[in-house]
Regions:
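Active-site-adjacent loop/helix micro-motif of nuclease/hydrolase catalytic cores
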Residues: 76-84
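Conserved catalytic cores of phosphodiester-cleaving nucleases, focusing on short active-site segments
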Residues: 18, 41, 62-76, 89
């Protein structure tokens, strides 16, 4: 399962770096870790956001890993706004599954979302 391999890669990053760094460091480390878990990915993927068929603009998602959208956070705890934001990105992207990974907590926080 792709999500299980993404989570395994994320756990390795968290185990190695621990909490306390900025998001970009976890993004870079995850980009280094994913290929070792046999995963193909794109980083900083732009998605179009539409309203009633009209394009409103674009948003950037942190990763798309084999059709799974992945958002990275580095906060003490995931807040409702983070969950809602990730769910909105997932709906806008058209992907079916998303992961919200928070590396800032003492233990890696993982939220799986479905569209």
């Amino acid at each position: 399962d792709v999500t299980a391999r993404i989570i395994a890669a994320a756990k390795e990053v968290h185990r190695t770096l621990g909490p306390g760094f900025e998001e970009v460091f976890y993004q870079r480390a995850l980009a280094m870790e994913l290929p070792g878990h046999d995963l193909e990915f794109e980083r900083e993927v732009w998605i179009d956001v539409y309203y009633k068929g009209q394009k409103l603009g674009r948003k950037r998602v942190d990763f798309v890993v084999e059709e799974v959208m992945v958002e990275i956070k580095a906060k003490a705890a995931v807040e409702d706004v983070d969950f809602v934001q990730t769910l909105s990105y997932l709906k806008a992207s058209g992907y079916k599954v998303g992961l919200l990974l928070n590396f800032g907590a003492k233990t890696l926080e993982i939220k799986r979302l479905a569209n």
